[in-house]
Design a protein with these regions (language model features):
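Acidic anion/phosphate-binding donor-loop and adjacent secondary structure
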Residues: 63, 67, 149-153, 160-161, ...
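A conserved mid-protein helix/loop that constitutes part of the nucleotide-sugar donor-binding site
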Residues: 13-21, 194, 198-217, 234-240
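A charged, aromatic-enriched C-terminal amphipathic alpha-helix characteristic of glycosyltransferases
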Residues: 14, 331-365
């Protein structure tokens, strides 16, 4: 079986890591290739190539629709793919239309977001594009129930027309380790600090500006607090400037994109995620496997919540209210809450493999 995954980049974000984790466990019987529109090489491209995956780079749609379509058409005509799996949500119709014209009979549109903040123009585009995407797709996927309902509609979800592809993780990699905690905290000279962590792309969605303002309030309550930010993105320089303006440079650690996130979360005392919108964030599954408590925006779905140490707060609450909740949180749980659940990759991989096979067999009839 040959599957072509289409995504914006492979730079280590939640969706990228999810795809890598799934693919790395299925390459023995499935050939996965990738189409990306990013001009720069992502950190996951080399590991995927080592697994035997091909990475195709094509232009973005805004650089010219015909150019984009022709490049994708060449990939599809030069190779035989049983499935095309597009991760751009309601925007997938463009690629799926090309795939249909090229004879790809199994076409998946995947929603990774729920209740996204939109301008009027964006909302109109979604409302107009979603029905077209449904026409050109043969399968609808989503990362969770909320993402399924928001993107594909209550009716499609209730009628079982949407498959929930779990944002699963290698649960055992996130087991809490006192040794790793001590090593990392010593390495960054934060052994006696109260460490607040965040793993997210620096983007409007993840709301780093609000997080920095919250942290400024935390420092007034706990002078020993430090903020560990893992990731990068288009707003990173803006956030760094904000940190400088607020005089927090010595208390904020910019880690960049890291491959050792399972180790780094051991060093944290609490996780903070004030996102404006989310589908079902992989990071929250990961930290539950580590036993790390979290303070989270109410805009984030609760459907994957197993931990009793998750606190949900509205974004309308003040930065001081957030700061108090974070400052009062203590790391109590250390057991892996994800292992042997539906979010354990060992279980979820077999389920997804079966789904792919079922799709191909059904379309082959």
């Amino acid at each position: 079986m040959r599957i072509l995954e289409i995504t914006s980049d492979l730079d280590g974000g939640g969706v990228d890591r999810l795809l890598y984790d799934y693919c790395s466990r299925m390459t023995n019987d499935i050939q996965f290739d990738f189409v990306v529109t990013s001009k720069s090489e992502g950190i996951l491209e080399k590991p995927l190539k080592e697994l035997g995956c091909k990475i195709y780079r094509i232009s973005q749609i805004r650089e010219g629709l015909q150019k984009h379509n022709n490049q994708l058409k060449k990939i599809l005509t030069d190779n035989h793919y049983d499935i095309i799996h597009d991760h751009s949500g309601y925007k997938a119709w463009c690629n799926l239309r090309v795939a249909k014209k090229c004879g790809v009979t199994a076409r998946i549109a995947h929603s990774h977001q729920a209740f996204m903040a939109e301008t009027t123009k964006q909302k109109i585009m979604r409302i107009l594009s979603t029905p077209i995407t449904k026409i050109y797709s043969t399968e609808l996927f989503a990362c969770g129930n909320d993402a399924a309902k928001w993107m594909w509609g209550e009716k499609a979800f209730n009628n079982g027309k949407v498959y929930i592809m779990k944002n699963a993780i290698q649960a055992e990699r996130f087991n809490f380790s006192p040794e790793k905690r001590e090593r990392i905290r010593c390495e960054y000279n934060i052994a006696n600090k109260f460490v607040i962590g965040n793993v997210a792309r620096f983007s409007y969605q993840k709301n780093h500006e609000f997080l920095i303002n919250i942290f400024a309030q935390v420092k007034k309550i706990r002078t020993d607090a430090v903020l560990m930010l893992i990731g990068r993105g288009e707003l990173e320089d803006t956030v760094k400037a904000q940190v400088e303006t607020l005089g927090l440079r010595d208390s904020v650690i910019f880690m960049g994109v890291r491959n050792d996130v399972p180790d780094l979360v051991n060093a944290m005392d609490v996780f903070a995620l004030p996102s404006r919108f989310e589908g079902l964030p992989v990071t929250l599954v990961e930290i539950q496997a580590n036993g790390l408590p979290a303070v989270i925006s109410e805009n984030v779905t609760k459907e994957m919540t197993i931990s009793k140490d998750f606190t949900f707060i509205p974004l309308t609450q003040s930065t001081l209210a957030w700061a108090k909740a974070i400052s009062e949180t203590q790391r109590n749980e250390s057991r892996n809450l994800i292992k042997n659940t539906i979010y354990d990759l060992n279980i979820a991989t077999n389920e997804l493999r079966t789904k792919y096979l079922t799709i191909v067999q059904r379309k082959g009839k």
